[in-house]
Curated annotation (Swiss-Prot):
Native source organism of the sequence: Streptomyces coelicolor (strain ATCC BAA-471 / A3(2) / M145)
Gene name for this UniProt entry: pafA
Pathway noted in the entry: Protein degradation; proteasomal Pup-dependent pathway; Protein modification; protein pupylation
Biological process per Gene Ontology, one example term: protein pupylation
Protein residues bound to ATP: 53, 66, 420
Protein name in the entry: Pup--protein ligase
Enzyme type, top EC level: ligase
General remark: The reaction mechanism probably proceeds via the activation of Pup by phosphorylation of its C-terminal glutamate, which is then subject to nucleophilic attack by the substrate lysine, resulting in an isopeptide bond and the release of phosphate as a good leaving group.
EC number(s) stated in the UniProt entry for this protein: 6.3.1.19
Amino acid sequence: MDRRIFGLENEYGVTCTFRGQRRLSPDEVARYLFRRVVSWGRSSNVFLRNGARLYLDVGSHPEYATPECDNVTELVTHDKAGERILEGLLVDAERRLHEEGIAGDVYLFKNNTDSAGNSYGCHENYLVARHGEFSRLADILIPFLVTRQLLCGAGKVLQTPRGAVYCVSQRAEHIWEGVSSATTRSRPIINTRDEPHADAERYRRLHVIVGDSNMSETTMLLKVGATDLVLRMIEAGTVMRDLTLENPIRAIREVSHDITGRRKVRLASGREASALEVQREYYEKAVDFCERRGIRTGTVERVLELWGRTLDAIEAEDLDRIGTEIDWVMKYKLLERYRAKHNMTMSHPRVAQIDLAYHDIHRRRGLYYLLEKKGQAARVANDLKIFEGKSVPPQTTRARLRGDFIRRAQEQRRDFTVDWVHLKLNDQAQRTVLCKDPFRSVDDRVEKLIAGM
Protein backbone atom coordinates (compact mmCIF):
# COMPACT_ATOMS: atom_id res chain seq x y z
CA MET A 1 0.00 0.00 0.00
CA ASP A 2 1.74 3.16 -1.22
CA ARG A 3 -0.72 5.42 0.53
CA ARG A 4 -1.70 4.28 4.00
CA ILE A 5 -3.89 5.63 6.75
CA PHE A 6 -2.11 6.03 10.10
CA GLY A 7 -3.41 6.88 13.54
CA LEU A 8 -1.87 7.09 17.02
CA GLU A 9 -3.65 6.79 20.36
CA ASN A 10 -1.84 7.93 23.49
CA GLU A 11 -3.03 7.42 27.04
CA TYR A 12 -1.61 9.88 29.57
CA GLY A 13 -0.73 9.40 33.22
CA VAL A 14 -2.28 11.97 35.53
CA THR A 15 -1.60 13.19 39.07
CA CYS A 16 -2.07 16.23 41.29
CA THR A 17 0.48 16.95 44.01
CA PHE A 18 1.10 19.62 46.63
CA ARG A 19 4.64 19.93 48.02
CA GLY A 20 5.46 16.46 46.73
CA GLN A 21 2.42 14.73 48.27
CA ARG A 22 -0.51 13.43 46.27
CA ARG A 23 -3.36 15.88 46.63
CA LEU A 24 -6.25 14.36 44.66
CA SER A 25 -7.05 10.88 43.38
CA PRO A 26 -6.59 10.28 39.63
CA ASP A 27 -10.41 10.14 39.30
CA GLU A 28 -10.78 13.60 40.85
CA VAL A 29 -7.97 15.08 38.73
CA ALA A 30 -9.53 13.60 35.58
CA ARG A 31 -12.87 15.20 36.49
CA TYR A 32 -11.24 18.63 36.75
CA LEU A 33 -9.30 18.06 33.53
CA PHE A 34 -12.40 17.14 31.55
CA ARG A 35 -14.79 19.65 33.10
CA ARG A 36 -14.39 22.04 30.18
CA VAL A 37 -14.80 19.20 27.67
CA VAL A 38 -17.95 17.92 29.38
CA SER A 39 -19.43 21.44 29.53
CA TRP A 40 -19.50 21.74 25.72
CA GLY A 41 -19.51 18.08 24.67
CA ARG A 42 -21.89 16.78 27.40
CA SER A 43 -19.59 13.77 27.63
CA SER A 44 -16.02 12.81 28.49
CA ASN A 45 -15.82 11.07 25.09
CA VAL A 46 -15.80 13.62 22.26
CA PHE A 47 -14.63 14.17 18.70
CA LEU A 48 -12.95 17.51 18.03
CA ARG A 49 -12.90 19.99 15.15
CA ASN A 50 -9.55 18.63 14.02
CA GLY A 51 -11.13 15.19 13.52
CA ALA A 52 -9.47 13.66 16.60
CA ARG A 53 -11.08 11.83 19.51
CA LEU A 54 -10.47 12.82 23.13
CA TYR A 55 -11.80 10.70 25.95
CA LEU A 56 -11.31 9.37 29.43
CA ASP A 57 -10.12 5.78 29.23
CA VAL A 58 -10.27 3.06 31.89
CA GLY A 59 -8.42 3.98 35.08
CA SER A 60 -8.84 7.75 34.64
CA HIS A 61 -6.31 8.01 31.81
CA PRO A 62 -7.05 10.81 29.34
CA GLU A 63 -6.60 9.39 25.85
CA TYR A 64 -6.10 11.28 22.60
CA ALA A 65 -6.57 9.52 19.26
CA THR A 66 -5.21 11.47 16.29
CA PRO A 67 -7.35 12.01 13.22
CA GLU A 68 -6.62 9.77 10.22
CA CYS A 69 -3.36 10.88 8.57
CA ASP A 70 -1.93 9.63 5.27
CA ASN A 71 1.67 10.63 5.87
CA VAL A 72 3.94 10.13 8.85
CA THR A 73 5.09 13.74 9.23
CA GLU A 74 1.49 14.90 9.50
CA LEU A 75 0.84 12.13 12.03
CA VAL A 76 3.69 13.42 14.24
CA THR A 77 2.25 16.94 13.98
CA HIS A 78 -1.22 15.77 15.02
CA ASP A 79 0.12 13.68 17.89
CA LYS A 80 1.89 16.80 19.20
CA ALA A 81 -1.30 18.84 18.66
CA GLY A 82 -3.02 16.37 21.00
CA GLU A 83 -0.32 17.01 23.59
CA ARG A 84 -0.98 20.75 23.34
CA ILE A 85 -4.75 20.27 23.69
CA LEU A 86 -4.18 18.26 26.88
CA GLU A 87 -1.68 20.85 28.14
CA GLY A 88 -4.47 23.44 27.73
CA LEU A 89 -6.84 21.28 29.79
CA LEU A 90 -4.13 20.91 32.46
CA VAL A 91 -3.64 24.69 32.79
CA ASP A 92 -7.42 25.14 32.96
CA ALA A 93 -7.77 22.44 35.65
CA GLU A 94 -5.04 24.03 37.81
CA ARG A 95 -6.77 27.41 37.55
CA ARG A 96 -10.12 25.93 38.61
CA LEU A 97 -8.52 24.10 41.53
CA HIS A 98 -6.89 27.31 42.77
CA GLU A 99 -10.20 29.19 42.40
CA GLU A 100 -11.78 26.55 44.65
CA GLY A 101 -9.01 26.93 47.21
CA ILE A 102 -7.26 23.64 46.40
CA ALA A 103 -3.52 24.23 46.16
CA GLY A 104 -1.74 21.76 43.94
CA ASP A 105 0.04 21.15 40.66
CA VAL A 106 -1.59 19.00 37.99
CA TYR A 107 0.74 16.79 35.98
CA LEU A 108 0.10 14.93 32.74
CA PHE A 109 2.75 12.42 31.73
CA LYS A 110 3.10 11.04 28.24
CA ASN A 111 4.64 7.79 29.42
CA ASN A 112 3.54 4.16 29.86
CA THR A 113 4.01 3.15 33.49
CA ASP A 114 3.22 4.66 36.87
CA SER A 115 4.92 4.20 40.24
CA ALA A 116 2.44 1.47 41.20
CA GLY A 117 3.51 -0.65 38.23
CA ASN A 118 0.39 -0.06 36.14
CA SER A 119 0.84 0.27 32.40
CA TYR A 120 -1.09 2.32 29.86
CA GLY A 121 -0.43 2.44 26.20
CA CYS A 122 0.49 4.04 22.95
CA HIS A 123 -1.45 2.26 20.22
CA GLU A 124 -0.43 2.54 16.58
CA ASN A 125 -2.95 1.97 13.80
CA TYR A 126 -2.06 1.03 10.24
CA LEU A 127 -4.63 0.42 7.53
CA VAL A 128 -3.81 -2.79 5.63
CA ALA A 129 -5.56 -4.54 2.75
CA ARG A 130 -8.05 -7.25 3.75
CA HIS A 131 -6.94 -9.77 1.10
CA GLY A 132 -3.50 -10.40 2.63
CA GLU A 133 -2.86 -13.32 4.95
CA PHE A 134 -2.96 -11.81 8.44
CA SER A 135 -1.03 -14.64 10.11
CA ARG A 136 1.88 -14.17 7.66
CA LEU A 137 1.82 -10.45 8.37
CA ALA A 138 1.98 -11.10 12.12
CA ASP A 139 4.75 -13.72 11.79
CA ILE A 140 7.04 -11.34 9.90
CA LEU A 141 6.11 -8.32 12.00
CA ILE A 142 6.57 -9.75 15.51
CA PRO A 143 10.40 -10.15 15.43
CA PHE A 144 10.58 -6.62 14.00
CA LEU A 145 8.33 -5.18 16.72
CA VAL A 146 10.11 -7.03 19.54
CA THR A 147 13.48 -5.57 18.50
CA ARG A 148 12.14 -2.19 17.27
CA GLN A 149 12.35 -0.83 20.84
CA LEU A 150 16.08 -0.24 20.14
CA LEU A 151 14.94 2.45 17.69
CA CYS A 152 11.99 3.89 19.54
CA GLY A 153 11.90 2.90 23.21
CA ALA A 154 11.25 5.74 25.65
CA GLY A 155 13.69 4.39 28.26
CA LYS A 156 12.95 3.54 31.88
CA VAL A 157 14.71 3.17 35.21
CA LEU A 158 13.49 -0.24 36.33
CA GLN A 159 13.69 -1.13 40.02
CA THR A 160 14.75 -4.77 40.46
CA PRO A 161 15.64 -6.82 43.56
CA ARG A 162 19.31 -6.34 42.55
CA GLY A 163 18.98 -2.56 42.28
CA ALA A 164 17.85 -0.20 39.53
CA VAL A 165 18.73 -0.79 35.88
CA TYR A 166 18.16 1.35 32.80
CA CYS A 167 15.95 -0.32 30.19
CA VAL A 168 15.24 0.59 26.60
CA SER A 169 11.45 0.23 26.76
CA GLN A 170 8.72 1.08 29.27
CA ARG A 171 6.12 -1.20 27.76
CA ALA A 172 8.23 -4.37 27.42
CA GLU A 173 7.64 -5.55 31.02
CA HIS A 174 3.88 -5.42 30.47
CA ILE A 175 3.48 -7.45 27.26
CA TRP A 176 2.23 -10.99 27.78
CA GLU A 177 1.18 -12.34 24.38
CA GLY A 178 2.16 -12.21 20.72
CA VAL A 179 -1.20 -11.83 19.02
CA SER A 180 -4.52 -11.51 20.85
CA SER A 181 -7.85 -9.70 20.81
CA ALA A 182 -7.42 -8.21 24.30
CA THR A 183 -5.69 -4.89 25.01
CA THR A 184 -5.78 -4.59 28.78
CA ARG A 185 -5.92 -8.02 30.36
CA SER A 186 -3.20 -9.84 28.47
CA ARG A 187 -1.50 -7.02 26.49
CA PRO A 188 -0.39 -8.60 23.22
CA ILE A 189 2.13 -7.21 20.73
CA ILE A 190 -0.49 -7.06 17.98
CA ASN A 191 -4.17 -6.72 18.81
CA THR A 192 -6.46 -8.64 16.45
CA ARG A 193 -9.84 -7.21 17.45
CA ASP A 194 -11.22 -6.57 13.98
CA GLU A 195 -12.60 -3.03 13.93
CA PRO A 196 -11.39 -1.55 10.65
CA HIS A 197 -13.33 1.77 10.99
CA ALA A 198 -13.54 1.41 7.19
CA ASP A 199 -14.98 -0.87 4.51
CA ALA A 200 -14.47 -4.26 6.19
CA GLU A 201 -14.45 -6.11 2.87
CA ARG A 202 -11.45 -4.10 1.65
CA TYR A 203 -9.45 -3.18 4.74
CA ARG A 204 -8.43 -4.19 8.19
CA ARG A 205 -6.77 -2.08 10.83
CA LEU A 206 -3.49 -3.37 12.20
CA HIS A 207 -3.49 -2.38 15.87
CA VAL A 208 0.03 -2.44 17.39
CA ILE A 209 0.09 -1.95 21.16
CA VAL A 210 3.66 -2.88 21.98
CA GLY A 211 5.28 0.54 21.48
CA ASP A 212 6.19 3.24 23.98
CA SER A 213 4.73 6.75 23.88
CA ASN A 214 7.30 9.12 22.43
CA MET A 215 8.19 12.66 23.41
CA SER A 216 10.74 12.93 20.59
CA GLU A 217 9.29 13.81 17.19
CA THR A 218 12.13 12.08 15.34
CA THR A 219 11.68 8.88 17.37
CA MET A 220 7.96 8.90 16.53
CA LEU A 221 8.76 9.42 12.84
CA LEU A 222 11.17 6.48 12.89
CA LYS A 223 8.79 4.21 14.82
CA VAL A 224 5.88 4.62 12.41
CA GLY A 225 7.96 5.17 9.26
CA ALA A 226 10.04 2.00 9.68
CA THR A 227 6.93 -0.06 10.50
CA ASP A 228 5.22 1.29 7.37
CA LEU A 229 8.18 0.19 5.24
CA VAL A 230 8.14 -3.31 6.73
CA LEU A 231 4.40 -3.51 6.00
CA ARG A 232 4.98 -2.39 2.41
CA MET A 233 7.56 -5.15 1.96
CA ILE A 234 5.20 -7.77 3.37
CA GLU A 235 2.37 -6.53 1.13
CA ALA A 236 4.65 -6.68 -1.93
CA GLY A 237 5.55 -10.30 -1.11
CA THR A 238 9.22 -9.55 -0.40
CA VAL A 239 10.98 -12.75 0.65
CA MET A 240 12.21 -12.39 4.23
CA ARG A 241 14.54 -14.60 6.22
CA ASP A 242 12.66 -16.53 8.91
CA LEU A 243 13.39 -14.63 12.13
CA THR A 244 10.52 -16.13 14.14
CA LEU A 245 11.38 -15.94 17.84
CA GLU A 246 11.21 -19.02 20.06
CA ASN A 247 9.57 -16.98 22.83
CA PRO A 248 8.67 -13.39 21.85
CA ILE A 249 7.58 -12.49 25.38
CA ARG A 250 10.88 -13.49 26.95
CA ALA A 251 12.77 -11.90 24.04
CA ILE A 252 11.04 -8.53 24.42
CA ARG A 253 12.24 -8.29 28.02
CA GLU A 254 15.75 -9.50 27.19
CA VAL A 255 16.07 -6.86 24.47
CA SER A 256 14.75 -4.12 26.75
CA HIS A 257 17.26 -4.98 29.49
CA ASP A 258 20.29 -4.63 27.20
CA ILE A 259 21.07 -1.13 25.93
CA THR A 260 23.98 -2.47 23.82
CA GLY A 261 21.59 -4.41 21.56
CA ARG A 262 24.05 -7.32 21.58
CA ARG A 263 22.32 -9.85 23.79
CA LYS A 264 21.31 -12.92 21.80
CA VAL A 265 17.71 -14.09 21.71
CA ARG A 266 16.67 -17.57 20.60
CA LEU A 267 14.92 -18.01 17.28
CA ALA A 268 12.40 -20.79 16.61
CA SER A 269 14.91 -22.34 14.18
CA GLY A 270 17.32 -22.92 17.08
CA ARG A 271 19.69 -20.17 15.92
CA GLU A 272 20.44 -17.13 18.04
CA ALA A 273 20.51 -13.49 16.95
CA SER A 274 20.93 -10.15 18.68
CA ALA A 275 18.36 -7.36 18.48
CA LEU A 276 20.87 -5.39 16.39
CA GLU A 277 21.23 -8.29 13.93
CA VAL A 278 17.45 -8.72 13.61
CA GLN A 279 16.92 -4.99 13.04
CA ARG A 280 19.83 -4.86 10.58
CA GLU A 281 18.16 -7.60 8.52
CA TYR A 282 14.91 -5.60 8.24
CA TYR A 283 16.77 -2.35 7.62
CA GLU A 284 18.88 -3.73 4.77
CA LYS A 285 15.80 -5.30 3.17
CA ALA A 286 14.00 -1.95 3.42
CA VAL A 287 16.89 -0.03 1.81
CA ASP A 288 17.02 -2.57 -1.03
CA PHE A 289 13.21 -2.51 -1.41
CA CYS A 290 13.06 1.29 -1.66
CA GLU A 291 15.92 1.37 -4.18
CA ARG A 292 14.35 -1.30 -6.39
CA ARG A 293 10.93 0.35 -6.29
CA GLY A 294 12.21 3.90 -6.66
CA ILE A 295 10.57 5.00 -3.40
CA ARG A 296 12.27 8.33 -2.83
CA THR A 297 10.22 10.69 -0.68
CA GLY A 298 11.84 13.03 1.82
CA THR A 299 10.15 11.20 4.69
CA VAL A 300 11.27 7.73 3.56
CA GLU A 301 14.84 8.94 3.08
CA ARG A 302 14.86 10.56 6.51
CA VAL A 303 13.47 7.37 8.10
CA LEU A 304 16.04 5.12 6.40
CA GLU A 305 18.93 7.46 7.26
CA LEU A 306 17.96 7.64 10.94
CA TRP A 307 17.22 3.89 11.12
CA GLY A 308 20.68 3.01 9.77
CA ARG A 309 22.47 5.63 11.86
CA THR A 310 20.70 4.45 15.04
CA LEU A 311 21.83 0.85 14.47
CA ASP A 312 25.39 2.04 13.69
CA ALA A 313 25.51 4.25 16.81
CA ILE A 314 24.31 1.48 19.13
CA GLU A 315 26.71 -1.03 17.56
CA ALA A 316 29.65 1.38 17.93
CA GLU A 317 28.50 2.31 21.48
CA ASP A 318 28.61 5.93 20.32
CA LEU A 319 25.18 7.12 21.47
CA ASP A 320 26.09 10.79 20.98
CA ARG A 321 25.44 10.24 17.26
CA ILE A 322 21.72 9.90 18.04
CA GLY A 323 21.72 11.95 21.24
CA THR A 324 19.09 14.45 20.06
CA GLU A 325 16.86 12.06 18.10
CA ILE A 326 16.06 8.85 20.00
CA ASP A 327 14.01 9.07 23.20
CA TRP A 328 15.70 6.37 25.31
CA VAL A 329 19.14 7.75 24.42
CA MET A 330 18.15 11.37 25.17
CA LYS A 331 16.81 10.36 28.57
CA TYR A 332 19.78 8.10 29.33
CA LYS A 333 22.24 10.93 28.62
CA LEU A 334 20.19 13.27 30.83
CA LEU A 335 20.21 10.77 33.72
CA GLU A 336 23.91 9.97 33.33
CA ARG A 337 24.85 13.68 33.39
CA TYR A 338 22.76 14.21 36.52
CA ARG A 339 24.15 11.13 38.28
CA ALA A 340 27.75 12.11 37.50
CA LYS A 341 27.17 15.66 38.74
CA HIS A 342 25.58 14.56 42.03
CA ASN A 343 27.43 11.26 42.46
CA MET A 344 24.24 9.16 42.64
CA THR A 345 23.40 5.55 41.92
CA MET A 346 20.63 4.64 39.47
CA SER A 347 18.50 3.62 42.49
CA HIS A 348 18.38 7.14 43.96
CA PRO A 349 14.81 8.55 44.19
CA ARG A 350 15.89 11.76 42.40
CA VAL A 351 16.86 9.68 39.36
CA ALA A 352 13.35 8.18 39.25
CA GLN A 353 11.91 11.71 39.48
CA ILE A 354 13.96 12.86 36.50
CA ASP A 355 12.89 9.76 34.56
CA LEU A 356 9.28 10.84 35.11
CA ALA A 357 9.86 14.58 34.53
CA TYR A 358 11.13 13.80 31.01
CA HIS A 359 7.52 12.92 30.11
CA ASP A 360 5.83 15.97 31.68
CA ILE A 361 3.92 17.59 28.79
CA HIS A 362 3.86 21.05 30.41
CA ARG A 363 6.27 22.96 28.17
CA ARG A 364 7.60 25.20 30.94
CA ARG A 365 8.27 22.26 33.25
CA GLY A 366 8.92 19.02 31.33
CA LEU A 367 12.54 17.99 30.84
CA TYR A 368 12.03 16.92 27.23
CA TYR A 369 10.86 20.45 26.46
CA LEU A 370 13.85 21.86 28.33
CA LEU A 371 16.07 19.90 25.92
CA GLU A 372 14.00 21.17 22.99
CA LYS A 373 14.44 24.80 24.12
CA LYS A 374 18.20 24.27 24.31
CA GLY A 375 18.26 22.90 20.76
CA GLN A 376 19.02 19.39 22.06
CA ALA A 377 15.91 17.72 20.57
CA ALA A 378 15.65 17.37 16.79
CA ARG A 379 12.28 18.32 15.26
CA VAL A 380 9.97 16.95 12.58
CA ALA A 381 6.98 19.25 13.02
CA ASN A 382 6.99 22.99 13.59
CA ASP A 383 5.10 24.94 16.23
CA LEU A 384 2.83 26.77 13.80
CA LYS A 385 1.68 23.52 12.15
CA ILE A 386 1.13 21.97 15.60
CA PHE A 387 -0.96 24.97 16.66
CA GLU A 388 -3.03 24.66 13.46
CA GLY A 389 -3.42 20.93 14.10
CA LYS A 390 -5.33 21.68 17.32
CA SER A 391 -8.32 22.88 15.28
CA VAL A 392 -7.73 22.02 11.61
CA PRO A 393 -8.07 18.39 10.43
CA PRO A 394 -5.77 16.73 7.87
CA GLN A 395 -7.04 17.86 4.45
CA THR A 396 -6.45 14.64 2.48
CA THR A 397 -8.34 12.02 4.54
CA ARG A 398 -11.81 11.35 5.94
CA ALA A 399 -10.84 13.41 9.01
CA ARG A 400 -11.52 16.53 6.94
CA LEU A 401 -15.17 15.52 6.46
CA ARG A 402 -15.61 14.84 10.17
CA GLY A 403 -13.82 18.01 11.25
CA ASP A 404 -15.77 20.24 8.85
CA PHE A 405 -19.06 18.65 9.92
CA ILE A 406 -18.30 19.16 13.63
CA ARG A 407 -17.18 22.77 13.10
CA ARG A 408 -20.35 23.66 11.18
CA ALA A 409 -22.66 21.87 13.63
CA GLN A 410 -21.06 23.66 16.58
CA GLU A 411 -21.25 27.05 14.85
CA GLN A 412 -24.94 26.46 14.09
CA ARG A 413 -25.54 25.06 17.61
CA ARG A 414 -26.92 21.86 16.15
CA ASP A 415 -27.09 18.62 18.11
CA PHE A 416 -25.00 15.92 16.43
CA THR A 417 -23.40 12.52 16.93
CA VAL A 418 -20.19 11.36 15.24
CA ASP A 419 -17.82 8.43 15.41
CA TRP A 420 -15.01 7.29 13.08
CA VAL A 421 -17.41 6.36 10.26
CA HIS A 422 -20.77 8.06 10.99
CA LEU A 423 -21.84 11.71 10.84
CA LYS A 424 -25.35 12.26 12.18
CA LEU A 425 -27.57 15.28 12.79
CA ASN A 426 -29.86 14.67 15.75
CA ASP A 427 -32.91 16.38 14.28
CA GLN A 428 -36.30 14.99 13.31
CA ALA A 429 -34.94 13.57 10.07
CA GLN A 430 -31.99 11.92 11.91
CA ARG A 431 -29.90 12.39 8.76
CA THR A 432 -26.81 10.18 8.82
CA VAL A 433 -23.90 9.79 6.42
CA LEU A 434 -21.73 6.67 6.53
CA CYS A 435 -18.12 7.41 5.47
CA LYS A 436 -16.51 4.02 4.84
CA ASP A 437 -13.53 5.19 2.81
CA PRO A 438 -10.86 6.74 5.08
CA PHE A 439 -8.96 8.03 2.00
CA ARG A 440 -11.86 10.22 0.85
CA SER A 441 -11.68 13.86 1.89
CA VAL A 442 -14.46 15.12 -0.42
CA ASP A 443 -18.01 13.75 -0.32
CA ASP A 444 -21.15 15.31 -1.85
CA ARG A 445 -23.37 13.74 0.82
CA VAL A 446 -21.40 15.39 3.62
CA GLU A 447 -21.35 18.72 1.81
CA LYS A 448 -25.14 18.50 1.45
CA LEU A 449 -25.51 17.69 5.15
CA ILE A 450 -23.32 20.68 6.09
CA ALA A 451 -25.10 23.02 3.66
CA GLY A 452 -28.50 22.03 5.07
CA MET A 453 -27.68 23.13 8.62
